Amino acid sequence: MKKPLMKSLLVAFSALLATSVVPLSSAQANDTLGQKVQYDTKAPVNDGKDISIQYWTWNDGDPAIKLAESYQKLHPNVKIEVVNHPWDDYWTKLPLALQGSDGPAIFNIHNSQDKLLSSYLEAYDIPTEDLKADFTGVEPHVVDGKVNYIDIVMNTGNIYYNKKMWQAAGLTDKDIPKTWDEFRQVAKKLTIKEGDNLVQAGFNWNGSYAGLYQGLNYQKGTLLFQEDGTTPNYNNETTKENLKFLVDLYEVDGVGSKDFGTDDTQSFGNQQSAMVYKWGWFANELKTKYPDVEYGVFATPTFSKDQPFAYDRYNGESTPGINKNQSEEQRKVAQDFLKYLLANDQYSLEAAKAYASYPTKNSVQEDKSLKSDPVLSVIAPRIKKLIWPGPFPATMETSAKKAAEEVLYNGVDLDSALENAQRQMERDMRNESFKSLESAYQ
């Protein structure tokens, strides 16, 4: 990311927390939504003839689902069938479906799967300059003057904690840890055992290492990629130190366990774990699947009280993709629905709330409904010290995850696990065109 973009993010984010609602434009008060990207709500779709398209996603809280309902009310002749696949199944089923002519006309995208999907994507039928005028951060997604998707929000990792468990342990807001050493002590207080059996984990990172290691490495000034910007930088002393730190939380401090389930998301939702590291999407996960959990959020600790090299990575949640292999009739409807999403401020607001993330649409960055969001208020002070490495290939996370599992479950030593993961990452990226954007961070 270029420095001017980061400055614009900081200014806009500060405004988000300090100002009130932006009034609707005169166009929005009539039949047209949007600023530069506009949508005519009265224009017929598919010449008014009945048509059905599919929208695929992996997320029950996907904001496009809610907007699909309002779109269908505007256009009763259009039916949008939402198909929800679990995350792990999604990336197997979607590419197979897109190869033929019967795949979904429009679908949810995660930028870590850019290479997997790029050959199936139809460029947006919206002028790129209009997108740039309405949204922050479009430029990194421009290819040959067009975009296949952009970021609707940007987010990063935080620590979520169970408020009831926190209170039961005698902790208050004054005990929010700033450093990892303080965090270890808090985690111990939150841990409950019956004999040798772990009943309540003080901190559970089972399933979250792939994202957690990146922020820990950044805090110590170690980038994810080597100086050439293309070679993974996983097998190093920083990664080793940080993985040992996480393992020691379990094996030395006893605040969690590799055997305490494989999914920290579910464990926190079932109120078996007191703290987890999660990104903005987790707020909506709790709202939709675990509404009884009373939770709080605080910034991920650092290794000292001094400002680190960076606090963490940040990433964007992507706008939907259009299937270029679908029929022209279906693609036109999909493009129309997409324009409805991007012109409609409500889509950005729903995304910001669903993912607890910073909205990229300029017209909603000052909306007062976002000011009280607990996650946004925690992200705000750190926004200038977050790194965007670009949409790196999935192996940077999948291979790292395997390394941690090898250490935890198979007794593989740290050096061997890191060497194996590094080798796998390099093998997977041998023919990649990816170039890290970390060098632009200042």
What is the meaning of each model-derived region?
Residues 186-189, 228-258:
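Glycine-centered hinge/linker elements that transmit conformational signals in sensory
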Residues 148-152, 157, 181-231, 238, ...:
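Extracytoplasmic/periplasmic solute-binding protein
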Residues 30-44, 109-158, 184, 214, ...:
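Hinge/lid segment of periplasmic solute-binding proteins
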Residues 48-59, 78-83, 106, 148:
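Short, well-ordered beta-strand elements
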Residues 105, 128-166, 201, 307-312, ...:
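A structural signal for short loop-to-beta-strand junctions that line the ligand-binding cleft
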Residues 39, 45-47, 142, 298, ...:
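Long, aromatic- and glycine/proline-rich binding clefts that accommodate carbohydrate-like moieties
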Residues 70-136, 168-170, 175-178, 274-275, ...:
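Extracytoplasmic "Venus flytrap"/periplasmic binding protein-like
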Residues 73-74, 79-81, 169, 252, ...:
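Extracytoplasmic/periplasmic substrate-recognition and gating elements
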